Each structure stands twice: as structure tokens, then as C-alpha cells.
């Protein structure tokens, strides 16, 4: 991050707002002595890993069915603010460490990761506002000029939809485009065509949490077939111009050592073989959470099976946690990590995790959550870190499109300096 002479934090506050699912979340605001300020809104997940930092809820059944966050809001005002007032806003690492120390727990359960993250991000935004530079430039410096390839979740299943599809996300990736702007257009065109395909088959339904269609389908393979048809009918070439990706979210259908999908239970080896078969039959270049989050031995077999052919992303497996990521690196498990700010709870720890992945030649995918807001921080983070990939849902629902629109503005702002990740060898290596 860029540095500047000391500018002190003058005020910190927070409030309870609503996310895209109508559930409460935190909005934090940090004001500097110069009048510059930053506001950040914290997302929330539906399919959550067991090892994520703790999201503090009120558990008061009389308000929002227990989902309120007034306790976390009070923690910002009464515990975090007194600790940070008068602190240099440009010392992000020190600010984040002070909050971690004040919390004192291993998973931020005392103050709440949602409370801590809101202040962490709002501080960075205030600092970038003080310098009058965009957040991606503040975090990434002069090398922050690579636009990510979007992983567009156009068909939803699992915990993200009320349907019978086991796998959670079926995504398209415009890897053959010349720019982010062009890639986004390709994705929007395929999404529109997919709507027509589903309507013709009398499968058109509402959308899931992340804006993708959520029809009832006969199998997970039918979802892939629908994507191929939509791509081809949009006059694009599957695999060459637009590739496929999946978030299997297998922890959600792992029961008693078996993987239960398409109506029956399967052994881990059968499931590994099934995923390999799908990769052989479809232009899939990325699979997320192919095995259950604690099934380390079979994750290793899964990596041996597909790790040299496609990107294998750990989400529930790694939960943006450097300790779990290091274990995966040591064991030879996966080759990519999903990055979700609220899984670890501070900006500094997020950046450290991305740096560890990069050093060890793991790719990073910057990601939203199923419960989102209009906050566009992850768009700036993707450019700042040159991650090369972003997951922020479908081409539907304004909390998803807000991130895409932010990336369009960044690409325009960068002008001739803007690079599209697949064109410079960043993002998936396959």
C-alpha cells in the first residue's frame, strides 16, 4: 500500500443495514481528522466453511429471526473505536492487529469478524480518499492494472437456490476476450441466450442468491449441457472463447463419508472419478471445493487426478486462512485459493494470504458472498492484487452487477495501461 505522513482517525461508527437477502449486516464508517472518510459494508455467506472467522449475530428471536447485528455494531462503537481513535489511518497493519488483539480469540468471536472487517475496510477507503486515489491504486500501487476474468455464476444450485441441483455454481469464463469489457459483454449475451434456452424447455425459473437461474434439472450434467448450448447459440466457441467452471461445494452433500448427488451415495474415489469424467467431457477449467473441507487425504487424490489439468480451488478447505493454506501447500492439495474477506476478517490478513498463495504458485480467486451489498471493494481488490480472477455472481441483481460496473470503470480509467488477465498469463493456468 502507498504511504503518506500521518493522518489520524477522528471518528468511527457503525450501523445495521440489510444485505441482498434481506438480512442484517454491518456498515462501518471511518472519519479522518482532515474530513476524508470511508464507508464499508460487510457481506455474509450461505454455504460457509466450518473454519471461517466468526460472524457475530444477536440471536434475539424477536428481531430479524435472531440474525440482527446490533451487538457487533455496539462493539464497533464501544470497543473498537476507543482503541483506534488517534491512530494513523495509513498504518493498516497496525490497525488490524489492534483489533485482533482487542478481540483476543482465535476466530474473532468476541468482537465479531463482521465488526472488525467493516472497520478494516472503511479505514483503507478513508486512507485512499485522503490521497485522492482509487482504492485499487492505494492497495496495489503502480502495478494495479490487471483486470480479472469474471467467473459468472449463471446457473445456481445447492445452498444458493431452492431447487434439486446438487452442485452450487455453474459458471462461464470469457477467457478468449481481448478485454474485461468485451468479456463482460460475452457473458451477458450468453446469460440472455440461456434464458431463452430455459424458456424453450419450460425450465425458466426465478434466480438464486447470486443471480443465476435456478431450474430443477435431471442431473448436474444437464446444467453443463445447457451452458454449452447457450454458448454455442450465442455464436461463441466453448472452451476456446468461453470456458466452464463449477463450485461443487461438496461439503454440503457429504454425509457419513459418502458424497450424495444425483439421488444416490458415492464413495470419495467414485466422486473423484466422476469429476474427472466431467472434465474429460466438457471444457471445464476450474472446480471449486471438489471434496469435503476436512477430507484432506481424498483432496490429495483429487489433486493428483486433476491438478495438472485444471484449476482446483479451495474455499471451505482454506477459508482464506494462511495456516490452512500452508497445510494444503505442504500436502500438495489443490492449486488455487478462493479469497473471501469475511472468512478471515481483516484486509491485512487477506493480503497476506494472497501473497502466500502467489509465492507458492497457487492462483487466487477474489470472491463475493451469497449475501452481498452494493459495496464494490472486491473489484478493487482483484485489480490491486493482480489476482486475475473474480467471482461475483451472474449478470443479474444489482449487488452483483455493481462489482462488474466498478471493473468497467476501472478499465476505462486505466486506459491503455489496462491489461486483461488471460492475455498476460494471469488467472487460470489451463
Curated annotation (Swiss-Prot):
Could you say which residues bind (2R)-2-phosphoglycerate here? Answer: 168, 340, 369-370, 391
Spans through the membrane: none
Mind telling me which Pfam families this protein's record contains? Enolase_C, Enolase_N
Q: Name one GO biological process term.
A: glycolytic process
Q: What class of enzyme is it?
A: lyase
Task: Give the matching Gene3D superfamilies.
Answer: Enolase-like C-terminal domain, Enolase-like, N-terminal domain
Q: Would you tell me the Gene Ontology cellular component terms?
A: cell surface; extracellular region; phosphopyruvate hydratase complex
Keywords, A to Z, come to: Cytoplasm, Glycolysis, Lyase, Magnesium, Metal-binding, Secreted
User: What is the reaction catalyzed?
Assistant: (2R)-2-phosphoglycerate = phosphoenolpyruvate + H2O
Required cofactor(s): Mg(2+)
Note the superkingdom of the native organism: Bacteria
Where, per UniProt, does this protein localize? Answer: Cytoplasm; Secreted; Cell surface
- Matches recorded under PANTHER family: ENOLASE (PTHR11902:SF1)
Task: State the function annotated in the UniProt record.
Answer: Catalyzes the reversible conversion of 2-phosphoglycerate (2-PG) into phosphoenolpyruvate (PEP). It is essential for the degradation of carbohydrates via glycolysis.
Specify the protein name: Enolase
* Source species of the chain: Rippkaea orientalis (strain PCC 8801 / RF-1)
Q: Which gene encodes it?
A: eno
Amino acid at each position: 500500500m502507498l504511504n503518506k505522513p500521518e493522518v489520524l482517525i477522528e471518528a468511527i461508527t457503525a450501523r445495521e443495514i440489510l444485505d441482498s437477502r434481506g438480512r442484517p449486516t454491518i456498515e462501518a464508517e471511518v472519519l479522518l481528522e482532515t474530513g476524508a472518510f470511508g464507508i464499508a459494508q460487510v457481506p455474509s455467506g450461505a454455504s460457509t466453511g466450518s473454519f471461517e472467522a466468526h460472524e457475530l449475530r444477536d440471536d434475539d428471536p424477536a428481531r430479524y429471526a435472531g440474525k440482527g447485528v446490533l451487538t457487533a455494531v455496539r462493539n464497533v462503537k464501544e470497543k473498537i473505536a476507543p482503541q483506534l481513535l488517534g491512530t494513523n489511518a495509513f498504518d493498516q497493519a497496525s490497525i488490524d492487529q489492534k483489533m485482533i488483539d482487542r478481540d483476543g480469540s482465535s476466530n474473532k468471536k468476541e468482537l465479531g469478524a463482521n465488526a472488525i472487517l467493516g472497520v478494516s475496510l472503511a479505514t483503507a477507503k478513508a486512507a485512499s480518499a485522503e490521497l485522492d486515489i482509487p482504492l485499487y491504486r492505494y492497495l496495489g500501487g503502480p502495478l494495479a492494472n490487471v483486470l480479472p476474468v469474471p467467473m459468472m455464476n449463471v446457473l445456481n444450485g445447492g445452498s444458493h437456490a431452492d431447487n434439486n441441483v446438487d452442485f452450487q455454481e455453474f459458471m462461464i469464463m470469457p477467457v478468449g476476450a481481448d478485454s474485461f469489457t468485451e468479456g463482460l459483454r460475452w457473458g451477458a449475451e450468453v446469460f440472455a441466450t440461456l434464458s431463452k434456452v430455459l424458456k424453450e424447455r419450460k425450465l425458466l425459473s426465478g434466480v438464486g442468491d447470486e443471480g443465476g437461474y435456478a431450474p430443477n434439472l435431471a442431473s448436474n450434467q444437464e446444467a453443463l449441457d445447457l451452458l454449452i448450448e447457450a454458448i454455442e447459440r450465442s455464436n461463441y466457441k466453448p472452451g476456446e472463447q468461453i470456458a466452464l467452471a463449477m463450485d461443487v461445494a461438496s461439503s454440503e452433500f457429504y454425509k457419513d463419508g459418502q458424497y450424495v448427488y444425483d439421488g444416490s451415495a458415492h464413495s470419495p474415489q467414485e466422486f473423484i472419478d466422476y469429476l474427472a469424467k466431467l472434465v474429460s467431457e466438457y471444457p471445464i477449467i476450474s472446480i471449486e471445493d471438489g471434496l469435503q473441507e476436512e477430507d484432506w487425504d481424498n483432496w490429495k487424490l483429487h489433486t493428483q487426478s486433476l491438478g495438472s489439468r485444471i484449476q482446483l480451488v479451495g474455499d471451505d478447505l482454506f477459508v482464506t486462512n494462511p495456516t490452512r493454506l500452508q497445510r494444503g501447500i505442504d500436502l500438495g492439495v489443490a492449486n488455487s485459493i478462493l479469497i473471501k474477506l469475511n472468512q478471515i476478517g481483516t484486509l491485512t490478513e487477506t493480503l497476506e494470504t494472497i501473497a502466500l498463495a502467489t509465492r507458492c504458485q497457487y492462483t487466487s480467486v477474489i470472491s463475493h458472498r451469497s449475501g452481498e451489498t452494493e459495496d464494490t471493494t472486491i473489484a478493487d481488490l482483484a485489480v490491486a492484487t493482480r489476482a486475475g480472477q473474480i467471482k461475483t455472481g451472474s449478470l443479474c441483481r444489482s449487488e452483483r452487477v455493481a462489482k462488474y460496473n466498478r471493473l468497467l470503470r476501472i478499465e476505462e480509467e486505466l486506459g491503455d495501461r489496462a491489461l486483461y488477465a488471460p492475455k498476460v498469463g494471469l488467472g487460470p493456468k489451463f
